[in-house]
Amino acid sequence: MKKLVVLFVVIWFGWQMQARQVLFPFPILGGELSNSAVTCVEDIDNVMPRMRALGLNTVLVPAYWELLESTEGRFDFTLTDRVIDKARENGLKVIFLWFGAWKNSMSCYAPLWFKTDTKRFPRAMTKTGKPMEIASCFSANVLQADNKAFTAFMRHLAEKDKGIGTVIMLQIENEIGMLEAARDHSPLAENTYDAPIPKVLWKTLGLRQRKTWRECFGDDPYGEEKFMAYHYAKYVEQLAQTARSIYDMPLYVNAAMNSRGRQPGQYPSAGPLAHLADFWHAGAPSIDLLAPDIYDTGFKGWADRYALPDNQLFVPESRCCENSGVRALYVFGEHRAIGFSPFAIDQSEPQSTASVTEAYRLIRQVFDLEDVSSYRRWGLLFDQEDKERTIIDDKTVITCRHFFTLPWDPRATDGSEWPEGGAMLLRLAKDEYLLAGSGIVVSFATEYEKQFEEEKELGEDGFVAEGKPSKEQKLIPNRFLGKRKGIGFVDEVRVDSLGQLRYLRRENGDQDHQGRHARISCGEWKILHIKLYEY
């Protein structure tokens, strides 16, 4: 009987003190469409088949307040319906992105009637009183208008999709945050800044007595960022409660990273950033995930910050590039991520989307494995600077390296920029592993054997580059009394629809360097089944 792969993801929310069980078609192999990709039905009709062809199972799609309610009080769901219908036709799931009061900090997707009535819908202001293209989150009118449209949207989704489940998750707003100033200085915001800090935050801030925000932080931009984070979260919580009451599904907010040494106000500050997680959890307990949009260098570091016991990792945006595929393998392997989604995949070059398609092909197969959730697994991601990792699995030492640490590919030493290499590594049983990825080499040793290992510089033939007296002879006079790990075989395999490994070919001789390692070269995408033995 064909195995249906469905994963029940249980997420523990420490701030809610309860377990929330979320049903996902796992893993989310996503792609986010460019901002203007679904503003007309013709574009929707064109883009959905292309996303299916790229190997996605989920499309992240904007829902535009300005087009949904171009006239106040009158709602048009033509685009919403078309997205859902075309997704169903192409076997895709949908995550809607509510472009409401804020998109990348700015209120650019608010309707014109909202933008022009700044008396009803006041703007955030700088310290000098300059209004910004950012609606103030302290305005009840702003919240009421945003939430009214969002309520209509959620009701329509429930009518259209409840019981079918094409829409699997929802993002509320997009990259909320302050720019130009660390906090809002409008009159409404100033009054709140002079009010007492809510008691729910006293423990977070280390308070023992009642204080105002101003008494705590003064004009310090990092303190002002905390103030804004809590109040943005309180605003989002109102929309989250609306969603929960109408069509309950997983909810998340996404964050632009505080990278490159910038201070609050120089990036979209006060968003759901890792260092502000306590403020977001306190203000928006109905939000399930705080999700990073990762565009800067150091992908692993950013992902690691959001893979927390109280926050399962989901990467809704990442630069679509030739490294996207191995980055997807990393987050699913290392952090058991819910999903991964390169941004503007509909506008990306073929060499960039190719890596996504290849990686998603491997990831689908890995998650088709029977009992995949029970296997110990790791994610690997390497570049020219960070090119090696050692894993201790019981008493087996696994050395994982970038493929270009081997000498025989000329790109390794000719000054070329190294593409990133990465993989998922799974332990199937004792001395049995599965490696799925690209640009990776893995070797195995016993702990005892590793103590006797010496560094060797290899030549192009894979042997020692230059003969010299053995360090082992000089430094380790004792006899070798332990055991070594050997590679019994390395097979390229695929995973069939029943979750079973199917042999494709044996990788021996030059392909595993006479039993020294298992490897997948840069540009190749494979699944290798590795069996070890001891001698």
Task: Name each model-derived stretch.
Residues 92, 238-248, 275-374:
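Catalytic-core region of carbohydrate-active enzymes that cleave or remodel glycosidic bonds
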Residues 4, 17-57, 89:
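N-terminal carbohydrate-binding accessory modules
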Residues 4-13:
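Sec-dependent N-terminal signal peptides
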Residues 411-417, 434-535:
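C-terminal beta-sandwich/jelly-roll accessory domains of carbohydrate-active enzymes
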Residues 27-40, 62-80, 127-148, 156, ...:
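The substrate-binding groove and active-site-proximal loops of carbohydrate-active enzymes
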Residues 120-277:
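Polysaccharide-binding and catalytic clefts of secreted carbohydrate-active enzymes
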Residues 329-451, 458-474:
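Aromatic- and carboxylate-lined catalytic core of secreted/periplasmic carbohydrate-active enzymes
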Residues 43-121, 232-246:
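Aromatic-lined substrate-binding rim segments of carbohydrate-active enzymes
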